[in-house]
């Protein structure tokens, strides 16, 4: 194993099961003219919550399920800026008895490899 084997690398579309489209907004850009790092996390969170709502796991109008973020990470490989159409790829890498590990990839629309990858661990604290 080399040092390069330990470095994060861009992933292809085949690493993800679901793709959720988004469009960047003018306010997403920072003073350097590219998407601010916090926006990546916002997009990852939005994609996960859309998945949970569509799967009827999360009901924002009165459901009892409550998931908290226990860990998250993001690796950046390519700049993204407004205006861009993007997609967040989502895959579940581990499903435990009270937690879910997600793998996420941010793609500029039409690209075959990720501009960024992320991971997030949700813990179900509601007992449902």
What are these regions (language model features)?
Residues 25, 77, 108:
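Residue-level recognition of the GNAT/N-acetyltransferase active site
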